[in-house]
A protein has these predicted regions:
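Amphipathic alpha-helical extensions and coiled-coil-like segments
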Residues: 89, 93-176
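Short capping/connector residues at structural and topological boundaries
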Residues: 6, 17, 22, 35, ...
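General structural signal for secondary-structure boundaries
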Residues: 1, 71-72, 174-176
Length: 176
């Protein structure tokens, strides 16, 4: 059994994982993970990597699973939908998931919106975050600014103005 290297979620909160592992140790896995068979043998996790990781942390050697034959496009869609419905993806994880659907499977923003149950403007706003300079993406990733603040920064004409505004935002947030 192997994780999906293209799954949208890239970080797993240690505290949340410990809580999930404790719950699984006490109650078991309440919902099976979704996997697909691999041509090379074995299976790939499509949905449920957090449950799988937490099960391993809890000492389980097996996890209930549903097996489905899925295309790469279906895997990406289901992984993104499942993550959006569970513990929130970080804003950049969500944006990168949408970008992968567009780049790898030629989805339009409208098709993504229908697939994940969001409005097209919500998809557009998420994707805009990928236009932030790398240092500001890091600030967003580490919770030093909100996605709303980050989108506001994109309205500045140049990167110097953006960076000055970002410093003000992070100072204000650290005072709260």
């Amino acid at each position: 059994l192997e994780p999906n290297r293209t799954q949208p979620r890239q970080s797993f909160d240690d505290g949340a994982m410990t809580e999930l592992a404790d719950s699984i140790a006490q109650h078991g896995v309440l919902q099976p993970i979704l996997v697909r068979p691999l041509l090379s043998g074995g299976y790939q996790i499509v949905a449920g990597e957090r449950r799988w990781r937490a099960s391993r942390m809890a000492g389980l050697t097996t996890v209930p699973a549903v097996i489905r034959d899925l295309t790469d496009s279906e895997v990406m869609q289901l992984a993104l939908i499942e993550n959006l419905q569970r513990e929130d993806l970080k804003p950049l994880e969500e944006a990168n998931g949408y970008k992968m659907l567009m780049d790898n499977f030629e989805f339009t923003q409208e098709e993504i919106a229908k697939t994940v149950g969001k409005s097209r403007p919500a998809i557009t706003n998420a994707l805009r975050l990928l236009n932030l300079p790398e240092d500001m993406q890091n600030m967003l990733e580490h919770g030093e600014m909100t996605a709303g603040h980050a989108r506001t920064l994109l309205s500045f004409k140049n990167e110097d103005q953006m960076k000055a505004a970002a410093r003000r935002v992070t100072m204000e947030l650290s005072l709260i």
